[in-house]
């Protein structure tokens, strides 16, 4: 099963709110998710508080082969999780990553 980490739109008209979910890549955007791993609120003016990522769960799914969509990748870059994943792919341990 090919899994993706992507955004699921919820919220009302003109007030978008997104959940960051793990989903089978063949399902529709708002289909049933395997797991919810965060949320994103683009309306929030404070860029530091407009998203939450469960970093440990996202890294676990990435290790299992899940693919990340571009919008979620941008959120991961903003939080530093994309760099952490890059270091993990190079074979560094958790202690070495924390020092970097």
Spans of model-derived segments:
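Structured, basic alpha/beta domains of bacterial-type, RNA-associated proteins
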Residues: 2-100
């Amino acid at each position: 099963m090919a899994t993706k980490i992507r955004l699921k739109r919820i919220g009302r008209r003109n007030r978008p709110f997104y959940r960051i979910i793990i989903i089978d890549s063949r399902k529709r955007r708002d289909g049933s998710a395997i797991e919810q791993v965060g949320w994103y609120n683009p309306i929030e003016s404070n860029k530091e508080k407009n998203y939450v990522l469960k970093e440990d769960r996202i890294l676990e799914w990435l290790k299992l082969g899940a693919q990340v969509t571009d919008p979620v990748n941008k959120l991961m870059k903003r939080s530093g999780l994309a760099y952490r994943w890059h270091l993990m792919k190079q074979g560094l341990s958790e202690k070495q990553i924390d020092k970097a």
